[in-house]
């Protein structure tokens, strides 16, 4: 998951593009904003209807609630998935860092190994859910639009 922040001339966040990739190599973006493009306050909840298949253990239904925060260079994104009540709550956090060309090179070399680790952890969690008997949803066709609001 990646987030792209759009700011106005006063450097206030007015929209956020939430880019979601699934394990099938597909991508969908949720364009998060207030109806009038008013500045988004840290901690404010933004909502998007779920229209993209991410997990075979969650139907393509319901909604996402997003909240973002930042303090002293630490950033956090909280994502809640609701369908007939809350089903999943997760967060992603990170910090700002300056990066030199050499660091960028080494990061690029480490990235494939990190991707393999993420895929292995995803499949391990899926196996545990399958063993528990959690309902399985077949993969539908991806949405026709690449970005939804």
Task: Go through the PLM ranges and name each one.
Residues 1-149:
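Mature, function-bearing regions of proteins
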């Amino acid at each position: 998951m990646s987030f792209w922040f759009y700011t106005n001339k006063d450097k206030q966040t007015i929209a956020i593009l939430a880019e979601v990739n699934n394990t099938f190599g597909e991508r969908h973006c949720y364009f998060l904003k207030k109806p009038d493009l008013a500045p988004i306050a840290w901690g404010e909840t933004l909502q998007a209807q779920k229209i993209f298949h991410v997990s075979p253990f969650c139907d393509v239904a319901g909604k996402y609630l997003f909240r973002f925060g930042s303090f002293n260079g630490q950033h956090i994104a909280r994502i809640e998935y609701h369908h007939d009540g809350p089903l999943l709550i997760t967060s992603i956090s990170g910090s700002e860092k300056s990066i030199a060309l050499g660091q960028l090179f080494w990061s690029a070399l480490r990235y494939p190994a990190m991707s393999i680790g993420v895929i292995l952890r995803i499949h391990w969690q899926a196996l545990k859910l399958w063993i528990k008997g959690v309902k399985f949803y077949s993969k539908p066709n991806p949405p026709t639009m690449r970005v939804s609001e």
